């Protein structure tokens, strides 16, 4: 079987194994800061993404097999005005040559003109766009900015959120959970996702985030740590 596994307890300010896109950078303290901060304050119209450098084999056409994976990370979203937040952060899988898309509500993952962008994402969405439910939510997105499944999210300003996302290939189940250790609340959402029809055989995995498009709807998006493991079974693994 093919196994990819990596873990960052913090990030290197000059990362060799992370591709930074847009405004993303690693701070001197080892935080992955996806959107821009100036004089300690988040900036509007910011878009940043970070990808693990090595492409990952997510399914194999010759054997018809699909990988299972699990990832966990911690992040903080902090807003100067907690009644005005935008726009959110996502974990995503996309083709290896993936580039930042539209900012604002499109979370750097999608745009309104190209409807065929191959991207599977779990979004932590802090602003209700026209296509969104009316509250902050955690959504599963398959080749669309509109979530196919979502759960309401009681976002906590400036608090560390622990996320665990898993994909079980045998049942095609993508599950995401978010927990706030500070008040022991948690949220879970899952959906049936066929990675083989949604994505190419090889992908890159990573994060994308955008701040709002007006000066008063802004927030920070910082990833503190990240681990990931995927396993693509070889045909011989179960021949007997």
Swiss-Prot record:
Superkingdom in the source lineage: Eukaryota
Residues engaged in binding Ca(2+): 125, 129, 132
Misc remark: Binds one manganese (or another transition metal) ion and one calcium ion. The metal ions are essential for the saccharide-binding and cell-agglutinating activities.
Record-given protein name: Seed lectin
Complexes and interactors: Homotetramer.
Originating species: Vatairea macrocarpa
Family, as annotated: Belongs to the leguminous lectin family.
Key words, A-Z: Calcium, Glycoprotein, Lectin, Manganese, Metal-binding
Signal peptide from the UniProt entry: none
RNA-binding as UniProt keyword: no
Biological function: Lectin that binds galactose.
Entry comment describing in which tissues the protein is expressed: Seed.
């Amino acid at each position: 079987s093919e196994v990819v596994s990596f873990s960052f307890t913090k990030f290197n300010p000059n990362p060799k194994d992370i591709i930074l896109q847009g405004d993303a950078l690693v701070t001197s303290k080892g935080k992955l800061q996806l959107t821009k901060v100036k004089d300690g304050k988040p900036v509007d119209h910011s878009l940043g993404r970070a990808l693990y450098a090595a492409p990952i084999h997510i399914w194999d056409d010759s054997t018809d097999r699909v990988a299972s994976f699990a990832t966990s990370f911690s992040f903080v979203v902090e807003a100067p005005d907690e009644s005005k937040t935008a726009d959110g952060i996502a974990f995503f899988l996309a083709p290896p040559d993936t580039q930042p898309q539209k900012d604002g509500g499109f979370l750097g993952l999608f745009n309104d003109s190209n409807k065929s962008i191959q991207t599977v994402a779990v979004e932590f969405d802090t602003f209700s766009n026209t296509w969104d439910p009316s509250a902050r939510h955690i959504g599963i997105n398959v080749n669309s900015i509109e979530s196919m499944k979502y759960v309401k999210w009681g976002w906590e300003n400036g608090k560390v959120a622990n996320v665990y996302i898993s994909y079980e290939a045998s049942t095609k189940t993508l599950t995401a959970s978010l927990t706030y250790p500070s008040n022991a609340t948690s949220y879970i959402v899952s959906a049936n996702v066929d990675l083989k029809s949604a994505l190419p055989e090889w992908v890159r995995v990573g994060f994308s985030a955008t701040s709002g498009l007006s000066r008063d709807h802004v927030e920070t998006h910082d990833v503190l740590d990240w681990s990931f493991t995927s396993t693509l079974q070889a045909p011989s693994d179960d021949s007997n």
